[in-house]
């Protein structure tokens, strides 16, 4: 296939996207500040040193970053503009990580760029009207709406309640890691 896929955040979802993309012959690159490069390399992934390098290298970038104070609006004009000609940005993370004003301006400046997201952005009408055939969104967030995800969320909640009642322990889940807080 010859296409290069960039995984922006190599957590559980990013790993599964990489696994599927490898199965169709894509070259996989990843950037994640929390995941050791050795983990990515063991999975046959090519780690890169920065988000800028990831976007400059890959034809397709798949976003999996959480919406935090440091990541909100971090996917901006300068970063996405590094993508090669005919780049495709796929956002299955959160809409808050996208600087929509920047992305609108960039898509106007770069008629080769495409954007796909699983949650309708605030500026959906502008994207749809100005960029037909280059933009697609679902009407609501779809990422966690599977039977398996809902079952796993229920099990995790039950374990946290039992842990709190039994041992006065609270757990916070961040990405693929778990942090314990003794109360």
Task: Give the location of each predicted region.
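Glycine-rich NAD(P)-binding loop of Rossmann-like domains
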Residues: 1-16
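Conserved S-adenosyl-L-methionine
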Residues: 23-26
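Conserved beta-strand positions in the Rossmann-like core of class I SAM-dependent methyltransferases
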Residues: 29
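Conserved acidic E/D residue at the C-terminus of a beta-strand in Rossmann-like folds
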Residues: 32
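Rossmann-like adenosine-cofactor binding region
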Residues: 35-129
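Adenosine-phosphate binding glycine-rich loop
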Residues: 119-169
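Conserved small/polar residues in nucleotide/adenosyl-binding loops
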Residues: 172-179
């Amino acid at each position: 296939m010859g296409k290069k896929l960039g995984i922006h955040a190599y957590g559980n979802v990013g790993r599964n996207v990489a696994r599927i993309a490898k199965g169709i012959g894509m070259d996989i690159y990843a950037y994640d500040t929390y995941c050791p490069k050795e983990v990515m390399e063991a999975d046959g992934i090519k780690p890169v040193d920065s988000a800028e390098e990831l976007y400059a290298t890959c034809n397709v970038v798949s976003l999996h970053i959480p919406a935090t104070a440091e990541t909100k609006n971090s996917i901006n004009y300068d970063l996405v503009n590094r993508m090669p000609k005919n780049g495709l940005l796929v956002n299955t993370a959160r809409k808050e990580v996208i600087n929509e004003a920047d992305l609108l301006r960039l898509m106007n400046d770069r008629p080769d760029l495409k954007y796909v997201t699983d949650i309708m952005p605030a500026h959906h009408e502008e994207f749809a009207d100005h960029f037909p055939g280059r933009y697609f969104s679902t009407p609501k967030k779809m990422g966690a709406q599977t039977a398996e995800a809902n079952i796993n969320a229920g099990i995790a909640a039950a374990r946290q309640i039992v842990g709190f009642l039994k041992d006065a322990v609270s757990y916070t889940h961040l990405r693929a890691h778990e942090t314990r807080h003794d109360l």
